[in-house]
Amino acid sequence: VPGYEWSSWQKGYGDVHATVDLSTLRLAAWQDRTALVLCDLASPADHQPVEISPRRILSRQVGLARELGYDPRAGSELEFFLLSESYDEAEARDFGEPRTSGWYVEDYHTMPATRQEPVIGAIRRAMDASGVPVESSKGEWGPGQHEINLRYTDVLEMSDRHVLYKHAAKEIAWAQGLGLTFMAKWHEEHA
């Protein structure tokens, strides 16, 4: 199977060279005096790009689309579940039943998401300050479920924004004593 020369259950993950992509350098506004930069991966043997790297695969596809005259762009609706306890607290009780930050459907309501605004607002503001424009946020269908929508852009830039957004959202929730998961179906009764 292609790609398994790089990693497998037997080999683990090998060493790679990380080449900084300065176009991704930006403020990590959810941390004090911190910036973040993403890297492309290269083989330590010949310094050639690691072709199975997700960022490299997407870059190749964008290049092919542009050769055909297209400019691939994307917007993202990224949903998550906000938990009313941190993962440390959940571990202390042996990861019993997770407790969501909400207890009923908030989709299409005008006020209920207000209860989680301290964390949702912090995520929105951190993203905007980090160069990741937020278009909207709202409560969703499941208990504790929310979405934050990122403004459309070039697809490679959008994938980079996903990396920042997901790290920031989890860290901001943790800093407020909450858990946050992007799992599509974290519980058998909730999706």
Predicted regions and their residues:
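Glycine-rich, acidic/polar active-site loops that bind/position phosphate-bearing ligands
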Residues: 1-191
